[in-house]
């Protein structure tokens, strides 16, 4: 049995670029996902709030989804919205940050600030962004988002091997340990001024003594708060050693993200030409040689375990 938490998506920005497709999947009540490990294996997952306990979103721009929020009125949702200080030189496809902040606030007013989390990541240093720059921007954004969320998550840049040459060309580097400590201490102190719980993502637990929540950004407690129910997870341990996060069933696919961030691990090759909002798959259509595997789906909600 697969996770009855669905995630849209760590692989590409579905809310920003594929909202019409997502709404159609909701209307038809199922979604297909091609395995990233086997190109001829497709999982078919029931896609309705009776079996999906929580639907998580990860996006740099929730604006395109706001007109579709009525389609999600019966769903329990959690939104991670990334707002960084970086400009077009690093995030060429991201709209003006003032528009993103406006969309963040609008989303918060519609779904509730407890369901919208601000992500300030990845944190890196470059000729354009110093320690001081991050302090100024984090303080500014914390002030602008005050009252619209109660949590901020940050992480430091991980440089994947296939990105190393590009990072060196742009002068981008991960902070040194002492620089991480300086920023982490500033983030937690500044965040508290604006009513924010400050959490780290997959950074281990070395910042716990700073007052930072290092448990993880998608833990059992987080998902239960989203579902408003106790959830009977088949495996209560997370998959990553750095945190206790429980990752949902990702309905996205790699490629096709128009943000084209220079630091992204999702590889920015263009798959828009194979996207069709009528297809049950995000990219392409099922092929005759594909194996389609029906996912056994059942809600994990404890029928007597209401949290509210």
Say what each PLM segment does.
Residues 1-90, 97-111, 270-308:
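Conserved Radical SAM active-site core
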Residues 11-13, 60-62, 82-86, 121-123, ...:
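Active-site beta-loop-alpha junctions enriched in small/polar residues
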Residues 86-94, 122-132, 167-175:
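Surface-exposed cleft-lining segments at the edges of enzyme active sites
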Residues 1-7, 15, 48, 211-254, ...:
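N-terminal [4Fe-4S]-dependent radical SAM core
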Residues 249-269:
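Local cysteine-cluster metal-coordination motifs and their immediate loop/turn environment
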Residues 99-166, 186-202:
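Conserved C-terminal portion of the radical SAM core fold
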Residues 162-249:
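A conserved mid-domain beta-alpha-beta active-site/ligand-binding segment of alpha/beta enzyme cores
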